[in-house]
């Protein structure tokens, strides 16, 4: 029996690898993500993973958003709130990580 193996590697460094805004998510998607009735969802992935805790703090201080999911091991962060609040939180979090911690940044994307 052949088993497929997947190896996930992180490169050393400080990086925001994804910052994405989902405006007006469908009911099914929001429910699957675990944030039903969200006007918008923000998704971030960060390296090193522990940065998700700092990003969550920055996001909540930047705008009226809530944390839907945070994983300090994988570096995943999901926030939710209104479209304007989530967009502002993502923008301020990305710029804050660059300014305060000298992270390599990515552009905010939207759908």
Swiss-Prot record:
Pathway assigned in UniProt: Amine and polyamine degradation; ethanolamine degradation
Signal peptide feature range: none
Gene Ontology cellular component annotations, sorted alphabetically: ethanolamine degradation polyhedral organelle
The keyword ATP-binding appears for this protein: no
Any coiled-coil regions, as ranges: none
Stimuli inducing this protein: The first gene of the 17-gene eut operon transcribed from a single promoter, induced by ethanolamine and adenosylcobalamin (AdoCbl, vitamin B12). Expressed at low levels following mouse infection, not induced in infected macrophages or in spleen.
The entry's keywords: Bacterial microcompartment, Virulence
Name of the protein this chain belongs to: Bacterial microcompartment shell protein EutS
Organism whose genome encodes this protein: Salmonella typhimurium (strain LT2 / SGSC1412 / ATCC 700720)
Primary gene name: eutS
